[in-house]
Swiss-Prot record:
Top-rank taxon, per record: Eukaryota
SUPFAM superfamilies: Annexin
Any one GO CC term of the record: cytosol
Annotated organism of origin: Homo sapiens
Function: Low affinity receptor for acetylcholine known to be targeted by disease-causing pemphigus vulgaris antibodies in keratinocytes.
Family: Belongs to the annexin family.
Name of the protein: Annexin A9
Annexin-type repeats, residues: 41-112, 113-184, 197-266, 270-341
UniProt cross-references to Gene3D superfamilies, sorted A to Z: Annexin (1.10.220.10)
Record's keyword terms, sorted: Annexin, Receptor, Repeat
PANTHER family in UniProt: ANNEXIN, ANNEXIN A9
Length: 345
């Protein structure tokens, strides 16, 4: 590693990443996920291997992790169906009986359809005795419109209640307005042309929204405009006021409303960095927050975990892989490391 002028020069990897802008590019194989469809997939062999792993002498946890963390979610669903046909037993229930602790939680999450997993996490967040508004924002603000629609449909089917009804009964004020707007969708799509006049109107509207009676102005701006437009609004707001929009949120809002708006602003500005921050926070706790680690690594491993890894390394000076190695112990370490995939030097 070279040193220039008394300062440590950036590593070759860091320099390349800074020029690539990995968070906004698609890799050569068409995804920024760490987990991709397994090319030599044999559903029969995988189902047989899992059966041997739980019926042999002792549970072969390594085999279970190896199969489930190297197959796409679609392939895992095919394995589950094959296992059911082969044994007349439910794979999730069989593995649940064989495993325990955080490894059990990881395996259960890996085997659930995406929408079912999200619906359960959203329900838990809305019904939590302590505030879990950040989880609700994460799910409602980072899923694609089709993913969110499917999640809400599963929510209604599984819990016999609309998610919007739970939001209405469990929240209030601007937080309720914000979550309802996100759940109902309606964010416009980017046409490729930035409307500078509308951006200026939004900036002025946010500046005028000083008192409690005007707080609702923030909701349509944050939930109906596309991210490209909002980034322009954030920039113009700072130029007009000399204050970052996040500072205005901290000054004007409190409690869950503040948490929700700050989280949403972070998602809008840089979604991979938003997730990197959440992972770092989960790893800094006295006991790692496994619920957060499991949810993010599993939900993003097939979409943009490479981007999240790059943002994590850039901001915190240490790779996500090494951070997981240092903080996570026990059987679940190998599973989370497999989802993370590799070291970033």
């Amino acid at each position: 590693m070279s040193v220039t002028g008394g300062k440590m020069a950036p590593s070759l990897t860091q320099e390349i990443l800074s020029h690539l802008g990995l968070a906004s590019k698609t890799a050569a194989w068409g995804t920024l996920g760490t987990l991709r469809t397994f090319l030599n997939f044999s559903v029969d062999k995988d189902a047989q291997r899992l059966l041997r792993a739980i019926t042999g002498q002792g549970v072969d946890r390594s085999a279970i992790v190896d199969v489930l963390t190297n197959r796409s979610r679609e392939q895992r669903q095919l394995i589950s169906r094959n296992f059911q046909e082969r044994t007349q037993q439910d794979l999730m229930k069989s593995l649940q009986a064989a495993l325990s602790g955080n490894l059990e939680r990881i395996v259960m999450a890996l085997l659930q359809p995406t929408a079912q997993f999200d619906a359960q996490e959203l329900r838990t967040a809305l019904k939590a005795s302590d505030s879990a508004v950040d989880v609700a924002i994460e799910i409602l603000a980072t899923r694609t419109p089709p993913q969110l629609q499917e999640c809400l449909a599963v929510y209604k089917h599984n819990f016999q209640v609309e998610a919007v009804d739970d939001i209405t009964s469990e929240t209030s004020g601007i937080l309720q307005d914000l979550l309802l707007a996100l759940a109902k969708g309606g964010r416009d799509s980017y046409s490729g042309i930035i409307d500078y006049n509308l951006a200026e109107q939004d900036v002025q509207a946010l500046q005028r929204a000083e008192g409690p009676s005007r707080e609702e102005t923030w909701v349509p701006v944050f939930t109906q405009r596309n991210p490209e437009h909002l980034i322009r609004v954030f920039d113009q707001y700072q130029r007009s006021t000399g204050q970052e929009l996040e500072e205005a949120v901290q000054n004007r809002f409190h409690g869950d409303a503040q948490v929700a708006l700050l989280g949403l602003a972070s998602v809008i500005k840089n979604t991979p960095l938003y997730f990197a921050d959440k992972l770092h926070q989960a790893l800094q706790e006295t006991e790692p927050n496994y619920q957060v680690l499991i949810r993010i690594l599993i939900s993003r491993c097939e979409t943009d975990l490479l981007s999240i890894r790059a943002e994590f390394r850039k901001k915190f000076g240490k790779s996500l892989y090494s951070s997981l190695q240092d903080a996570v112990k026990g059987d679940c370490q190998s599973a989370l490391l497999a989802l993370c995939r590799a070291e970033d030097m």
